[in-house]
């Protein structure tokens, strides 16, 4: 997809456009903010506004170029109060070196230096201007530029770079963060443009904790079943070995027989009566001899 105003190497490929369409990044909402009109392609009969995917890619590239200009990656702070963006911002921070704030934004993070969580970032990237309104407002107080994923009904107050996309679906949020991270790494020279990124886009998608628990339970059940099968197999082998070991070893039998033959019997030792009679002398004859 060729666009004017930038090098052709930064243009979106067919696969990028297909991914954006497959993740429903072009599906907006029924409401429309007046400052988002430039990013809307058309309005459907059911009232849903369709976002121009070409504009989405232009803003992804622009945002990536802004992020790449920050010397220290930790000075970039990514924020997501929306649960669908928690995993995406954490993965983005892990791959690009940014600082992530996933979950509730504590008021005063950017303005109150007394708090333990006080930060002085040079750039803020938000998932939703409505959900992350506190972070964007504080960024405006301390003159921090803001990049944000914006839907057709998102307010653009204090947002410097708006990336028009569907910021309510977990797939669209994950894909845009993944594309942004990939483009930043390409601009930094960390990865090559000629080869695909080895990180799957699924890693940026939100996952239900209950689904993770179910997978862990299924894995534990499979391990228990495999262990039970191994135990049963070992028991069967033990039965076969035990029955074979029940036969008497010929060498042991020969040794036992030889021992029995060599033993002396009490009966063979002699009769007590006979021996006593042979040793006893006549008392009367002895007395006469004396």
UniProtKB/Swiss-Prot annotation:
Residues 272-290 have a biased composition (Polar residues). It is found in: Cytoplasm. HAMAP family: Ribosomal_S2_euk. This is Small ribosomal subunit protein uS2A. Belongs to the universal ribosomal protein uS2 family. Keywords: Cytoplasm, Ribonucleoprotein, Ribosomal protein. Residues 257-290 are annotated as: Disordered. GO terms for molecular function: structural constituent of ribosome. Required for the assembly and/or stability of the 40S ribosomal subunit. Required for the processing of the 20S rRNA-precursor to mature 18S rRNA in a late step of the maturation of 40S ribosomal subunits. GO terms for biological process: cytoplasmic translation; ribosomal small subunit assembly. One of its GO terms (cellular component) is cytosolic small ribosomal subunit. It comes from the Eukaryota. Its main location: cytoplasm. CDD domains: RPS2. Pfam families: 40S_SA_C (PF16122), Ribosomal_S2 (PF00318). Component of the small ribosomal subunit. Mature ribosomes consist of a small (40S) and a large (60S) subunit. The 40S subunit contains about 33 different proteins and 1 molecule of RNA (18S). The 60S subunit contains about 49 different proteins and 3 molecules of RNA (25S, 5.8S and 5S). Interacts with rps21.
């Amino acid at each position: 997809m060729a666009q004017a105003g930038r090098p052709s190497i930064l243009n979106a490929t067919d696969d990028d456009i297909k991914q954006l369409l497959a993740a429903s990044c072009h599906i907006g909402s029924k409401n429309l903010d007046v400052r988002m009109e430039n990013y809307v392609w058309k309005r459907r009969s059911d009232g849903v506004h369709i976002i121009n995917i070409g504009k989405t890619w232009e803003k992804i590239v622009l945002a990536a170029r802004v992020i790449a200009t920050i010397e220290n990656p930790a000075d970039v702070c990514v924020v997501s109060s929306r649960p669908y963006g928690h995993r995406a911002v954490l993965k983005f921070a892990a791959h690009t070196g940014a600082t992530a704030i996933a979950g509730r934004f504590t008021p005063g993070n950017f303005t109150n230096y007394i708090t333990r969580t006080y930060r002085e970032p040079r750039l803020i990237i938000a998932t939703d201007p409505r959900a992350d309104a506190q972070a964007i407002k504080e960024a405006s107080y301390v003159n921090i530029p803001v990049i944000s994923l914006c839907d057709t009904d998102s307010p653009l107050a204090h947002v410097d770079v708006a990336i028009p996309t569907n910021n309510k679906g977990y797939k669209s949020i994950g894909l845009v963060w993944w594309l942004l991270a990939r483009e930043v790494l390409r601009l930094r020279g960390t990865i090559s443009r000629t080869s695909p990124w080895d990180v799957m886009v699924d890693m940026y998608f939100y996952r239900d904790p209950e689904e993770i628990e179910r997978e862990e339970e299924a894995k534990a059940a499979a391990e228990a079943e495999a262990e039970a099968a191994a135990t049963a197999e070992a028991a069967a082998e033990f039965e076969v070995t035990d029955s074979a070991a029940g036969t008497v070893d010929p060498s042991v039998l020969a040794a036992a027989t030889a021992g029995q033959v060599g033993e002396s019997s009490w009966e063979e030792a002699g009769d007590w009566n006979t021996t006593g009679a042979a040793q006893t002398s006549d008392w009367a004859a002895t007395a006469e001899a004396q």
